[in-house]
Structures are given as structure tokens and as C-alpha cells.
Curated annotation (Swiss-Prot):
This is Methylmalonate-semialdehyde/malonate-semialdehyde dehydrogenase [acylating], mitochondrial. Malonate and methylmalonate semialdehyde dehydrogenase involved in the catabolism of valine, thymine, and compounds catabolized by way of beta-alanine, including uracil and cytidine. Belongs to the aldehyde dehydrogenase family. It comes from Mus musculus. It comes from the Eukaryota. The modification N6-succinyllysine is found at K47, K52, K55, K76, K117, K129, K364, K376, K391, K517.
């Protein structure tokens, strides 16, 4: 009993140390008692408000499975109020000068930098990833905010003077209206920051639904945006699960939806949202291959494979979850296993941790079942992380690094996205065989080749049907001056996230044909024939 009380006290102390801003908006100190946990607020019309819902979801620390908060399933009235707030704020925000919107984002990126470690600690508490990885989560989102500050160049229109005598043609980009975002659990800061800053700097207002498992980072980001001078109503936040998703897909005032998450959810949101006339972009699942050529730099390649496969406990849509060893590279497999063995599994806030827990007990069970399927279907488990025990965190959702060899493309552990710290290894004799395996897989998020031969790298990059290719880069996530260009079954929509594509997604073109006669503007007689423009 005493140990349980001490553990609870330690957890509360850790929460209260996260951030003074969080205490005011998400983890109020006064909410702690022996019988209560803090509740996540809604953010509507510039205010953090308590939900009136009678349906709540527990938020767990994945390292302990202790409840650290409760998030509401927003009521219909609350969700309607959030959209109405966005709708009211839109005309004035869209009419705000682009330089003023840019200034809000410039202040915002500075506040994110100043509070980066606080956001990261909150991510580690709710999501489980290591503090260093959580800081990277925030930083990659911050890069998109910094890129959004270039809006004055990104939103330039086009013009063509004198298409015929005294007639000019020009176009410019305008915001859509109310846009919405549905974010996953694995990047609590980065993915929301892919969405609302890009949309808002273009003049849209935004409705955000963070993952119900990790809402805290988004709430703190909302507070920082408010402190940056964003007007009330330009960003609203609701919480929930299926009802909230359906609400976003169906509401007539929402013009566009950004989604990142699983294929099942992404396909559903794309179909339902598109059916209701909305613009939808959906980043979904992946099976990312790393092709290792025998001429690759062995030390660098092995280290990069281990980091990309097991970092964030494999809970990345760009995790390198499949290695294809070509020719003599298969001899490197024992050394790959040795490096993976040396990774330290622990709670994310513990010094020296390389990877933390999975998000839920259900996620752990699913990953272990997929590992089991490998043995049942004839694969070999070279490194087994299913029975790992982490001292002091025995109730956590931990799976250690796992390597499965002798894998065939027909096996379940290859066909399904595992989303855990599991690397499946295939072997081929030639590069062409490896390319065929990659192209036969339905996903198209990312891939990498490891080689010291430029011709080999060029052939691979040009022949694989994958949206993002790394050459000696295991996780080729583009910086935000480019766009995130996953393809095939990893993406639905026709316009990708951030970069030029992101601006295009959140804007619409207006084209104006203008004629100002050199002579008197008054026509001497009406023109009744079909205008031919160029004659």
C-alpha cells in the first residue's frame, strides 16, 4: 500500500513539473485528489473550457499504465460551437493582411522554441517516447512553422499581361474557409504542426482533433498560439473518437480535412469526406524497405538500420521496418543483431533510454501476435523482445527490439504494418529482385538504399515506385520546403502535406481576366459575337 501511494505521489509530482502553462490549461494542480485525475479542456473561441460530456476516456502513461488524465468525448453542441467559432472568425482572419498573419507565425515559432522541452516532457508522459525523441518530434513540427513564415513567397499568384490588346490575365490564391485536422498518437506535436499553422497562415480558420491518447501537446501548442496573437476562434480544439471524426467528415461548413493515421481510418475519412464535397489529404500506413548493397559502408549502414527500425519503438509511419540484404550483405546479419541487442529499453523519461514503450497494452498484444505469426509461418526469430522486463516499470507496454529473418513476401509479418520495434529481413541475390519486392508491396511511403555506387543509387531511385527515397538516408522525410510525398496505398488525395503542396491544399485559385481599353472605356457599340480572346 505504501509503495502504491509513493508511486502515485511521484507521478503527480512529475505531472506538476511539466509546465506552468500546462497546469493552467490541462493539468491544473487543484484537480489532484486521491479520487480524481486532471481533465483535458476543450479550446473554443479562445477559451479553455470544461466539457459537459458524460463520456470520458482515460489517458495512460504507457510506461506504467497509470491514468494521468481524462479526455472528453465532445458533445454535439460543443463541436457545433467550435465550428461556429471558426466560421465567425474566418472573414476577419482571411481579410487580415498576409504580413500580419506572418507576424503571428513568427512569434509562434519563437514561443515553441522557448517551450520545446516542456512540450517534449508532456509528450513523453502521454506517448512514452524518449525525451530526446520527443524533442525531435517538436523540432520537426517547428520546421514546418518556420517554413509557413515564408507565406509571402509561397502564396504568390501568376500573371500574364497583354494576352490580347488591353487585356491582362492574373490569378491569386485565397483561403478555403474552415479546415479541420485529425491527428494520430505517434507524433503529438509534429503532425498538428503540419496542419493548423500552414492552414492558418493562408487565411483559413482551423478545427483540430488531436488523438484522444495524447492531447496534451496540442493543448499547450494552442496556448502558445494564443500568446502569439492569433485571434479568438481562428483555432478551436475538440476531442473524441468516432463521433468526432464523423462530425468533421459531415459538417457542411468544413471545407477541407487533413488526416494522418491508419489505413482503415484514412480510407474511411477520405471516402466519407470526399462524398460530402470536402478536399481531403490522408497520410496512412507504410511498409518501408531498406535495401542494403554489399558495397555499402557497413558501420554506417548497420547503425542507421538499427536506429530507423527501433527508434520511437517503431511507432513511425516512416520507420524502416523491412531490410532487404542483397548478395554478400546477408553476412552482416549477426552484427545487425548485436547492435540491436545493445539498445536500452526504458521509460522515456529515464536517462539513457533508446526506446520506450508502445502506446497501449492492445498495441503490445498486436505486435507480439505478429511476431508469433512469423514463427508459425517459417521465419526465424534472431532477436526476441516479447518477454522483456523493465525494472521499475513492470506494468508498461514494453517490447524490445526484435529481428525476424528468413522472411518471405507472403508472410503475415511482412504484409502487415507492424508498428512496433520489429525489423523483418529478406534476402535477394540482385538489386532487380529487391526492386521487384519493393514495387510489389502496396505501400509507397518511403524507402532507402545503402550503397557507395552512384549508378546503383540512381537506378534504384528511378525504378522504385515509392514517393520518398533515401540514398544512405534511412528515414527520408523531406524538409518542409519540399512536400511529404508518400504515394500508392500510403496516401489518399491529390495534394500532399506542407511545402508548396501544403499551400495548394489550403488555398483555392481565383483567376481574373481584366480589360482596360487604351482609348475611351465607353464602347461605341455592343459586341454580340463570341469573344475569341487571342484573335
Amino acid at each position: 500500500m505504501a509503495a502504491a501511494v509513493a508511486a502515485a505521489a511521484a507521478m503527480r509530482s512529475r505531472i506538476l513539473q511539466v509546465s506552468s502553462k500546462v497546469n493552467a490549461t490541462w493539468y491544473p494542480a487543484s484537480s489532484f485528489s486521491s479520487s480524481s485525475v486532471p481533465t483535458v479542456k476543450l479550446f473554443i473561441d479562445g477559451k479553455f473550457v470544461e466539457s459537459k460530456s458524460d463520456k470520458w476516456i482515460d489517458i495512460h502513461n504507457p510506461a506504467t499504465n497509470e491514468v494521468v488524465g481524462r479526455v472528453p468525448q465532445s458533445t454535439k453542441a460543443e463541436m457545433d460551437a467550435a465550428v461556429e467559432s471558426c466560421k465567425r472568425a474566418f472573414p476577419a482572419w482571411a481579410d487580415t493582411s498576409i504580413l500580419s498573419r506572418q507576424q503571428v507565425l513568427l512569434r509562434y515559432q519563437q514561443l515553441i522554441k522557448e517551450n520545446l522541452k516542456e512540450i517534449a516532457r508532456l509528450i513523453t508522459l502521454e506517448q512514452g517516447k524518449t525525451l530526446a525523441d520527443a524533442e525531435g518530434d517538436v523540432f520537426r513540427g517547428l520546421q514546418v512553422v518556420e517554413h509557413a513564415c515564408s507565406v509571402t513567397s509561397l502564396m504568390l499568384g501568376e500573371t500574364m499581361p497583354s494576352i490580347t490588346k488591353d487585356m491582362d490575365l492574373y490569378s491569386y490564391r485565397l483561403p478555403l474557409g474552415v479546415c479541420a485536422g485529425i491527428a494520430p498518437f505517434n507524433f503529438p506535436a509534429m503532425i498538428p504542426l503540419w496542419m493548423f499553422p500552414m492552414a492558418m497562415v493562408c487565411g483559413n480558420t482551423f478545427l483540430m482533433k488531436p488523438s484522444e491518447r495524447v492531447p496534451g501537446a496540442t493543448m499547450l501548442l494552442a496556448k502558445l498560439l494564443q500568446d502569439s496573437g492569433a485571434p479568438d476562434g481562428t483555432l478551436n480544439i475538440i476531442h473524441g473518437q468516432h463521433d468526432a471524426v464523423n462530425f468533421i467528415c459531415d459538417h457542411p461548413d468544413i471545407k477541407a480535412i487533413s488526416f494522418v493515421g491508419s489505413n482503415q481510418a484514412g480510407e474511411y475519412i477520405f471516402e466519407r469526406g470526399s462524398r460530402n464535397g470536402k478536399r481531403v489529404q490522408a497520410n496512412m500506413g507504410a511498409k518501408n524497405h531498406g535495401v542494403v548493397m554489399p558495397d555499402a559502408n557497413k558501420e554506417n549502414t548497420l547503425n542507421q538500420l538499427v536506429g530507423a527500425a527501433f527508434g520511437a519503438a517503431g511507432q513511425r509511419c516512416m520507420a524502416l521496418s523491412t531490410a532487404i540484404l542483397v548478395g554478400e550483405a546477408k553476412k552482416w546479419l549477426p552484427e545487425l543483431v548485436d547492435r540491436a541487442k545493445n539498445l536500452r529499453v526504458n521509460a522515456g523519461d529515464q536517462p539513457g533510454a533508446d526506446l520506450g514503450p508502445l502506446i497501449t497494452p492492445q498495441a503490445k498484444e498486436r505486435v507480439c501476435n505478429l511476431i508469433d505469426s512469423g514463427t508459425k509461418e517459417g521465419a526465424s526469430i534472431l532477436l526476441d523482445g516479447r518477454r522483456i522486463k523493465v525494472k521499475g516499470y513492470e506494468n508498461g507496454n514494453f517490447v524490445g527490439p526484435t529481428i525476424i529473418s528468413n522472411v518471405k513476401p507472403s508472410m503475415t509479418c511482412y504484409k502487415e504494418e507492424i508498428f512496433g520495434p520489429v525489423l523483418v529481413v529478406l534476402e535477394t541475390e540482385t538489386l532487380d529482385e529487391a526492386i521487384k519486392i519493393v514495387n510489389d508491396n502496396p505501400y509507397g511511403n518511403g524507402t532507402a538504399i545503402f550503397t557507395t555506387n552512384g549508378a546503383t543509387a540512381r537506378k534504384y531511385a528511378h525504378m522504385v515506385d515509392v514517393g520518398q527515397v533515401g540514398v544512405n538516408v534511412p528515414i527520408p522525410v523531406p524538409l518542409p520546403m519540399f512536400s511529404f510525398t508518400g504515394s500508392r496505398s500510403s496516401f489518399r488525395g491529390d495534394t500532399n502535406f506542407y511545402g508548396k503542396q501544403g499551400i495548394q491544399f489550403y488555398t483555392q485559385l481565383k483567376t481574373i481576366t481584366s480589360q482596360w481599353k487604351e482609348e475611351d472605356a465607353t464602347l461605341s457599340s455592343p459586341a454580340v459575337v463570341m469573344p475569341t480572346m487571342g484573335r
